């Protein structure tokens, strides 16, 4: 069963190549259906879900190791906030698993891996580059904000001296960073919530996919906002134990 929020099918058109879908109206009930469908797919193919999730976890650990090795522990703050921006690209394999389950196609490692690697000749690398550039730009912006507000305090290790974040400057910095970070997240959400599944499902160019994705968001703003909040809550629940 496809995700009724993000797949091209829910935008009102049948599956066919080279057709950019027009957005259809959806309701918040689609969110519950999407979560139920995702859980159902995970139960049917848990090994695939765990493997692709492991890549995401290992990526986070790698960024943490880089920050600690460089002696720049404060990098962990923008990394924790910005790393989820890479999640849409990390989900490519999961989209393919769900598509195969829906279509009744064979589900084995070679076939899934083959499809994922074959994306190098389509629009996925372009979307990945956009996502990566946004992540890198976010890290740069976060670094700039930190330097502007903390000044010479930037030499302080915020992981061992968190009290500097509770000062007037620290709280203002966190507030501004949160607002700007939310802007990055909103832009990326608008681009990928429909765009990424669309370029996987059909032969469309990146610009058309992004435009169609934003059209779907603007056609259903409340539903998409609710969906984004659900994603954020699940994300924070995953980060909280850290």
Tell where the protein language model's regions lie, with residue ranges.
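Hydrophobic alpha-helical membrane segments
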Residues: 1-242
């Amino acid at each position: 069963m496809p995700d009724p929020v993000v797949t091209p099918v829910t935008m009102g058109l049948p599956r066919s190549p080279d057709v950019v879908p027009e957005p259809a109206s959806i309701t918040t009930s689609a969110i519950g259906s999407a979560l139920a469908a995702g859980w159902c797919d995970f139960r049917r193919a848990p090994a695939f879900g765990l493997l692709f999730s492991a890549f995401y976890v290992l990526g986070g650990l790698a960024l943490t190791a880089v920050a600690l090795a460089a002696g720049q522990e404060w990098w962990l703050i923008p990394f924790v906030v910005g790393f989820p921006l890479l999640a849409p690209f990390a989900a490519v394999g999961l989209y393919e698993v769900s598509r195969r389950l829906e279509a009744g196609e064979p589900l084995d490692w070679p076939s899934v891996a083959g499809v994922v690697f074959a994306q190098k000749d389509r629009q996925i690398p372009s979307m990945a580059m956009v996502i990566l550039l946004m992540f890198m730009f976010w890290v740069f912006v976060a670094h700039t904000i930190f330097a502007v507000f903390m000044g010479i305090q930037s030499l302080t290790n915020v992981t061992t001296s968190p009290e500097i974040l509770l000062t007037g400057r620290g709280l203002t910095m966190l507030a501004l960073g949160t607002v700007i970070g939310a802007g990055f997240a909103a832009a990326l959400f608008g681009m990928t919530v429909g765009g990424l599944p669309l370029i996987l499902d059909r032969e469309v160019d990146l610009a058309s996919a992004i435009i169609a994705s934003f059209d779907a968001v603007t056609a259903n703003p409340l539903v998409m906002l609710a969906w984004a909040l659900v994603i954020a809550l699940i994300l924070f629940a995953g980060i909280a134990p850290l």
